[in-house]
Protein backbone atom coordinates (compact mmCIF):
# COMPACT_ATOMS: atom_id res chain seq x y z
CA UNK A 1 0.00 0.00 0.00
CA UNK A 2 1.41 3.43 -0.90
CA UNK A 3 1.62 5.59 2.21
CA UNK A 4 -0.38 8.82 2.18
CA UNK A 5 0.31 9.90 5.74
CA UNK A 6 -1.39 13.30 5.65
CA UNK A 7 -3.86 12.38 2.92
CA UNK A 8 -1.43 12.53 0.01
CA UNK A 9 1.25 10.21 -1.34
CA UNK A 10 4.18 12.58 -1.57
CA UNK A 11 4.93 13.94 -5.08
CA UNK A 12 2.29 11.75 -6.78
CA UNK A 13 -1.15 12.73 -8.13
CA UNK A 14 -4.09 10.46 -7.32
CA UNK A 15 -4.62 9.82 -11.04
CA UNK A 16 -0.99 8.67 -11.29
CA UNK A 17 -1.49 6.31 -8.37
CA UNK A 18 -4.39 4.73 -10.20
CA UNK A 19 -3.11 4.75 -13.78
CA UNK A 20 0.70 4.64 -13.56
CA UNK A 21 1.29 2.84 -10.27
CA UNK A 22 -1.81 0.66 -10.31
CA UNK A 23 -2.48 1.08 -6.60
CA UNK A 24 -5.77 -0.29 -5.28
CA UNK A 25 -5.58 0.93 -1.67
CA UNK A 26 -3.57 3.63 0.10
CA UNK A 27 -2.77 4.36 3.73
CA UNK A 28 -3.56 7.43 5.85
CA UNK A 29 -2.46 8.26 9.39
CA UNK A 30 -4.89 9.10 12.18
CA UNK A 31 -2.44 11.17 14.23
CA UNK A 32 -1.51 13.48 11.36
CA UNK A 33 -5.01 13.78 9.88
CA UNK A 34 -6.52 14.48 13.30
CA UNK A 35 -4.11 17.38 13.83
CA UNK A 36 -4.41 18.67 10.27
CA UNK A 37 -6.81 19.25 8.55
CA UNK A 38 -8.87 17.93 11.49
CA UNK A 39 -11.96 15.77 11.74
CA UNK A 40 -14.41 18.65 11.23
CA UNK A 41 -13.01 19.29 7.76
CA UNK A 42 -12.94 15.59 6.88
CA UNK A 43 -16.52 15.09 8.09
CA UNK A 44 -17.72 18.07 6.05
CA UNK A 45 -15.92 16.70 2.97
CA UNK A 46 -17.58 13.30 3.31
CA UNK A 47 -14.48 11.42 4.45
CA UNK A 48 -10.87 11.23 3.35
CA UNK A 49 -11.64 9.45 0.06
CA UNK A 50 -13.64 12.44 -1.15
CA UNK A 51 -11.41 15.04 0.47
CA UNK A 52 -8.25 13.90 -1.33
CA UNK A 53 -9.86 12.75 -4.58
CA UNK A 54 -8.65 9.16 -4.27
CA UNK A 55 -12.13 7.68 -4.25
CA UNK A 56 -10.91 4.18 -3.47
CA UNK A 57 -10.16 2.02 -0.44
CA UNK A 58 -8.08 3.52 2.37
CA UNK A 59 -6.50 1.96 5.46
CA UNK A 60 -6.00 4.24 8.46
CA UNK A 61 -3.23 3.58 10.95
CA UNK A 62 -4.28 4.40 14.50
CA UNK A 63 -1.46 6.89 15.07
CA UNK A 64 -0.04 4.84 17.93
CA UNK A 65 3.42 4.61 16.39
CA UNK A 66 3.58 8.38 15.86
CA UNK A 67 2.32 9.19 19.36
CA UNK A 68 4.82 6.87 21.02
CA UNK A 69 7.66 8.32 18.97
CA UNK A 70 7.02 11.65 20.74
CA UNK A 71 9.05 10.48 23.72
CA UNK A 72 9.63 13.97 25.16
CA UNK A 73 6.09 15.28 24.79
CA UNK A 74 3.75 12.42 25.71
CA UNK A 75 2.52 10.76 28.90
CA UNK A 76 1.02 7.29 28.93
CA UNK A 77 -1.50 5.80 31.37
CA UNK A 78 -3.91 2.88 31.22
CA UNK A 79 -6.55 5.39 30.10
CA UNK A 80 -4.58 6.47 27.03
CA UNK A 81 -1.83 8.80 25.92
CA UNK A 82 -1.56 12.55 26.43
CA UNK A 83 0.72 14.25 23.93
CA UNK A 84 1.59 17.61 22.47
CA UNK A 85 1.18 18.38 18.79
CA UNK A 86 4.39 18.56 16.79
CA UNK A 87 2.75 21.42 14.87
CA UNK A 88 1.83 23.95 17.55
CA UNK A 89 2.49 22.31 20.92
CA UNK A 90 -1.22 21.99 21.78
CA UNK A 91 -2.18 19.22 24.22
CA UNK A 92 -4.30 16.22 23.18
CA UNK A 93 -5.51 12.90 24.60
CA UNK A 94 -5.79 9.69 22.59
CA UNK A 95 -7.80 6.92 24.19
CA UNK A 96 -8.93 3.75 22.40
CA UNK A 97 -12.46 5.15 22.24
CA UNK A 98 -11.32 8.51 20.92
CA UNK A 99 -9.16 6.91 18.23
CA UNK A 100 -12.07 4.74 17.07
CA UNK A 101 -14.25 7.84 16.79
CA UNK A 102 -11.54 9.67 14.82
CA UNK A 103 -11.04 6.75 12.44
CA UNK A 104 -14.80 6.56 11.87
CA UNK A 105 -14.71 10.26 10.95
CA UNK A 106 -11.73 9.84 8.62
CA UNK A 107 -13.64 7.05 6.91
CA UNK A 108 -10.98 4.44 6.25
CA UNK A 109 -12.27 1.15 4.87
CA UNK A 110 -9.85 -0.61 7.21
CA UNK A 111 -9.25 0.85 10.67
CA UNK A 112 -6.36 -0.14 12.93
CA UNK A 113 -6.73 -0.66 16.67
CA UNK A 114 -4.93 1.72 19.02
CA UNK A 115 -1.80 0.06 20.34
CA UNK A 116 1.57 0.74 21.91
CA UNK A 117 4.55 0.13 19.64
CA UNK A 118 7.59 -0.50 21.88
CA UNK A 119 11.09 -0.36 20.40
CA UNK A 120 12.66 -3.53 19.06
CA UNK A 121 15.24 -3.37 21.84
CA UNK A 122 12.70 -3.32 24.72
CA UNK A 123 13.44 -5.77 27.53
CA UNK A 124 11.07 -8.61 28.38
CA UNK A 125 9.52 -6.87 31.38
CA UNK A 126 8.59 -3.79 29.40
CA UNK A 127 7.40 -5.90 26.46
CA UNK A 128 5.10 -7.82 28.84
CA UNK A 129 3.64 -4.63 30.35
CA UNK A 130 3.22 -3.08 26.92
CA UNK A 131 1.44 -6.12 25.52
CA UNK A 132 -1.00 -6.24 28.43
CA UNK A 133 -1.74 -2.54 27.93
CA UNK A 134 -2.27 -3.03 24.20
CA UNK A 135 -4.63 -5.96 24.79
CA UNK A 136 -6.65 -3.92 27.29
CA UNK A 137 -6.90 -1.12 24.76
CA UNK A 138 -7.93 -3.61 22.07
CA UNK A 139 -10.95 -4.70 24.11
CA UNK A 140 -11.99 -1.06 24.43
CA UNK A 141 -11.42 -0.47 20.70
CA UNK A 142 -13.74 -3.31 19.72
CA UNK A 143 -16.36 -2.29 22.27
CA UNK A 144 -16.45 1.22 20.80
CA UNK A 145 -16.23 0.04 17.19
CA UNK A 146 -19.11 -2.41 17.60
CA UNK A 147 -21.30 0.18 19.32
CA UNK A 148 -20.94 2.78 16.55
CA UNK A 149 -21.88 2.91 12.87
CA UNK A 150 -20.03 3.99 9.71
CA UNK A 151 -20.69 7.59 8.71
CA UNK A 152 -20.38 7.51 4.93
CA UNK A 153 -22.55 4.67 3.70
CA UNK A 154 -20.02 1.81 3.48
CA UNK A 155 -18.77 -0.78 5.93
CA UNK A 156 -15.52 -0.39 7.84
CA UNK A 157 -13.32 -3.18 9.20
CA UNK A 158 -11.19 -3.11 12.36
CA UNK A 159 -7.89 -5.00 12.45
CA UNK A 160 -6.21 -5.86 15.79
CA UNK A 161 -2.42 -5.48 15.95
CA UNK A 162 -0.13 -8.24 17.25
CA UNK A 163 2.72 -6.87 19.36
CA UNK A 164 5.31 -8.59 21.58
CA UNK A 165 8.68 -7.15 20.46
CA UNK A 166 11.08 -10.05 19.65
CA UNK A 167 9.85 -12.51 22.29
CA UNK A 168 8.25 -15.57 20.63
CA UNK A 169 6.09 -16.48 23.61
CA UNK A 170 4.66 -12.95 23.79
CA UNK A 171 4.04 -12.82 20.04
CA UNK A 172 2.32 -16.21 20.13
CA UNK A 173 0.19 -15.17 23.10
CA UNK A 174 -0.78 -11.92 21.40
CA UNK A 175 -1.80 -13.75 18.23
CA UNK A 176 -3.89 -16.22 20.21
CA UNK A 177 -5.63 -13.40 22.05
CA UNK A 178 -6.44 -11.25 19.01
CA UNK A 179 -8.06 -14.08 17.04
CA UNK A 180 -10.69 -14.32 19.78
CA UNK A 181 -12.21 -11.16 18.27
CA UNK A 182 -12.92 -12.94 14.95
CA UNK A 183 -11.81 -9.81 13.08
CA UNK A 184 -11.91 -9.27 9.33
CA UNK A 185 -8.10 -9.21 9.27
CA UNK A 186 -5.05 -9.02 11.52
CA UNK A 187 -1.93 -6.88 11.62
CA UNK A 188 1.60 -7.61 12.76
CA UNK A 189 3.08 -4.48 14.28
CA UNK A 190 6.25 -3.48 16.08
CA UNK A 191 8.69 -4.89 13.54
CA UNK A 192 11.32 -3.06 11.51
CA UNK A 193 11.81 -0.84 14.58
CA UNK A 194 15.40 -1.70 15.45
CA UNK A 195 15.41 -5.49 15.67
CA UNK A 196 17.57 -7.69 13.43
CA UNK A 197 16.32 -9.07 10.12
CA UNK A 198 16.50 -12.60 11.54
CA UNK A 199 14.36 -11.59 14.52
CA UNK A 200 11.85 -9.93 12.22
CA UNK A 201 11.53 -13.03 10.04
CA UNK A 202 11.21 -15.29 13.09
CA UNK A 203 8.46 -13.15 14.63
CA UNK A 204 6.49 -13.21 11.37
CA UNK A 205 6.72 -17.01 11.32
CA UNK A 206 5.64 -17.32 14.96
CA UNK A 207 2.61 -15.07 14.51
CA UNK A 208 1.47 -16.52 11.19
CA UNK A 209 1.47 -20.02 12.66
CA UNK A 210 -1.45 -18.80 14.78
CA UNK A 211 -3.34 -16.25 12.67
CA UNK A 212 -6.11 -17.72 10.46
CA UNK A 213 -5.18 -18.31 6.84
CA UNK A 214 -8.58 -17.18 5.54
CA UNK A 215 -8.17 -13.57 6.75
CA UNK A 216 -5.77 -10.88 5.49
CA UNK A 217 -2.49 -10.68 7.41
CA UNK A 218 -0.94 -7.22 7.32
CA UNK A 219 2.72 -6.56 8.15
CA UNK A 220 3.03 -2.91 9.13
CA UNK A 221 5.83 -0.63 7.96
CA UNK A 222 7.92 -3.14 5.97
CA UNK A 223 10.06 -2.73 3.93
CA UNK A 224 12.76 -3.34 1.30
CA UNK A 225 11.99 -5.49 -1.76
CA UNK A 226 13.81 -8.40 -0.11
CA UNK A 227 11.86 -7.87 3.13
CA UNK A 228 8.62 -7.99 1.18
CA UNK A 229 9.46 -11.30 -0.49
CA UNK A 230 10.59 -12.75 2.85
CA UNK A 231 7.27 -11.68 4.39
CA UNK A 232 5.19 -13.09 1.54
CA UNK A 233 7.06 -16.38 1.85
CA UNK A 234 5.98 -16.47 5.50
CA UNK A 235 2.30 -15.86 4.80
CA UNK A 236 1.90 -12.07 4.79
CA UNK A 237 -0.77 -10.62 2.46
CA UNK A 238 -0.53 -6.84 2.94
CA UNK A 239 2.30 -4.39 3.56
CA UNK A 240 2.95 -0.67 3.60
CA UNK A 241 6.16 1.33 3.75
CA UNK A 242 7.39 4.86 3.10
CA UNK A 243 10.57 3.57 1.44
CA UNK A 244 9.45 3.79 -2.21
CA UNK A 245 8.60 7.49 -1.97
CA UNK A 246 11.13 8.54 0.66
CA UNK A 247 14.02 6.82 -1.10
CA UNK A 248 12.77 8.06 -4.45
CA UNK A 249 12.92 11.65 -3.22
CA UNK A 250 16.50 10.91 -2.19
CA UNK A 251 17.42 9.68 -5.69
CA UNK A 252 17.37 5.95 -4.90
CA UNK A 253 15.51 3.90 -7.47
CA UNK A 254 14.59 0.23 -7.08
CA UNK A 255 14.66 -2.11 -10.08
CA UNK A 256 14.62 -5.84 -10.78
CA UNK A 257 18.39 -5.66 -11.38
CA UNK A 258 19.25 -3.66 -8.25
CA UNK A 259 19.19 -0.10 -6.91
CA UNK A 260 20.37 3.04 -8.68
CA UNK A 261 21.61 6.24 -7.05
CA UNK A 262 20.55 8.81 -9.61
CA UNK A 263 22.97 11.41 -8.29
CA UNK A 264 25.95 9.30 -9.38
CA UNK A 265 28.06 10.70 -12.21
CA UNK A 266 27.96 7.32 -13.99
CA UNK A 267 24.47 8.18 -15.29
CA UNK A 268 25.50 11.58 -16.70
CA UNK A 269 25.62 10.42 -20.33
CA UNK A 270 23.55 7.23 -20.09
CA UNK A 271 20.72 7.87 -22.52
CA UNK A 272 19.05 4.49 -22.10
CA UNK A 273 15.49 4.34 -20.68
CA UNK A 274 15.22 4.90 -16.96
CA UNK A 275 14.20 1.26 -16.47
CA UNK A 276 13.70 -1.06 -19.46
CA UNK A 277 11.86 -3.51 -17.18
CA UNK A 278 9.63 -0.87 -15.59
CA UNK A 279 5.85 -0.78 -15.90
CA UNK A 280 5.15 2.98 -15.77
CA UNK A 281 5.42 5.58 -18.51
CA UNK A 282 8.23 7.41 -16.69
CA UNK A 283 10.43 4.35 -17.24
CA UNK A 284 9.99 4.65 -20.99
CA UNK A 285 9.70 8.43 -21.40
CA UNK A 286 12.82 9.52 -19.52
CA UNK A 287 16.47 8.52 -19.67
CA UNK A 288 18.85 7.90 -16.81
CA UNK A 289 20.88 10.92 -17.89
CA UNK A 290 17.84 13.19 -17.80
CA UNK A 291 16.68 12.03 -14.37
CA UNK A 292 20.22 12.41 -13.06
CA UNK A 293 20.22 15.97 -14.44
CA UNK A 294 16.91 16.72 -12.70
CA UNK A 295 18.28 15.63 -9.34
CA UNK A 296 21.50 17.61 -9.88
CA UNK A 297 19.41 20.70 -10.65
CA UNK A 298 17.07 20.12 -7.67
CA UNK A 299 14.08 20.04 -9.99
CA UNK A 300 10.76 18.97 -8.44
CA UNK A 301 10.07 16.76 -11.45
CA UNK A 302 12.85 14.45 -10.25
CA UNK A 303 10.90 13.68 -7.07
CA UNK A 304 7.75 12.92 -9.05
CA UNK A 305 9.46 10.65 -11.58
CA UNK A 306 11.38 8.74 -8.91
CA UNK A 307 8.34 8.30 -6.67
CA UNK A 308 6.16 7.02 -9.51
CA UNK A 309 8.89 4.65 -10.65
CA UNK A 310 9.49 3.19 -7.18
CA UNK A 311 5.81 2.77 -6.36
CA UNK A 312 5.16 1.12 -9.73
CA UNK A 313 8.10 -1.21 -9.15
CA UNK A 314 6.83 -2.22 -5.70
CA UNK A 315 3.38 -2.96 -7.09
CA UNK A 316 4.94 -4.94 -9.95
CA UNK A 317 7.00 -6.88 -7.39
CA UNK A 318 4.00 -8.01 -5.36
CA UNK A 319 1.84 -8.74 -8.40
CA UNK A 320 4.61 -10.89 -9.85
CA UNK A 321 4.95 -12.65 -6.51
CA UNK A 322 1.22 -13.37 -6.53
CA UNK A 323 1.47 -14.78 -10.06
CA UNK A 324 4.20 -17.21 -9.02
CA UNK A 325 2.27 -18.24 -5.91
CA UNK A 326 -0.66 -19.16 -8.14
CA UNK A 327 1.69 -21.01 -10.50
CA UNK A 328 3.12 -22.95 -7.57
CA UNK A 329 6.74 -21.91 -8.12
CA UNK A 330 7.13 -18.95 -5.74
CA UNK A 331 10.17 -20.33 -3.89
CA UNK A 332 12.25 -21.01 -7.00
CA UNK A 333 11.27 -17.66 -8.52
CA UNK A 334 12.17 -15.84 -5.30
CA UNK A 335 15.58 -17.50 -5.27
CA UNK A 336 16.20 -16.41 -8.86
CA UNK A 337 15.56 -12.69 -8.22
CA UNK A 338 16.38 -12.20 -4.53
CA UNK A 339 20.08 -11.31 -4.68
CA UNK A 340 19.68 -8.95 -7.64
CA UNK A 341 17.17 -6.83 -5.72
CA UNK A 342 19.85 -5.68 -3.27
CA UNK A 343 22.62 -5.12 -5.82
CA UNK A 344 23.96 -1.58 -6.27
CA UNK A 345 24.08 -0.58 -9.90
Description of each model-found segment:
Residues 38-45, 248-262, 315-318:
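C-terminal helical cap(s) of enzyme catalytic domains, especially alpha/beta-barrels
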Residues 98, 102, 129, 133-140, ...:
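A non-catalytic, amphipathic alpha-helix used as a structural packing/dimerization or gating element
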Residues 115-121, 275-345:
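C-terminal extensions of enzymes
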Residues 1-151, 265-268:
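Non-catalytic, usually N-terminal nucleic-acid engagement modules in DNA/RNA processing proteins
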Residues 108, 139, 143-146, 209-212, ...:
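Generic secondary-structure signature for well-ordered alpha-helical cores
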Amino acid sequence: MPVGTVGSVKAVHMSELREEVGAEIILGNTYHLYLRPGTDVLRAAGGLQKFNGWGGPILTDSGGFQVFSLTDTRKMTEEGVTFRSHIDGSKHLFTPERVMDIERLIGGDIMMAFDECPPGTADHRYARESLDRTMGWLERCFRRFRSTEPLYGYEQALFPIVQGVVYPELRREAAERVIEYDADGYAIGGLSVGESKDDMRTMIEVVNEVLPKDRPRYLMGVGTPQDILDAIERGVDMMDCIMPTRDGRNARLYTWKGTMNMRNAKWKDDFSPLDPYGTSSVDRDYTKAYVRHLFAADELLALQIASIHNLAFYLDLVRTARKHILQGNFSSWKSSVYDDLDRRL
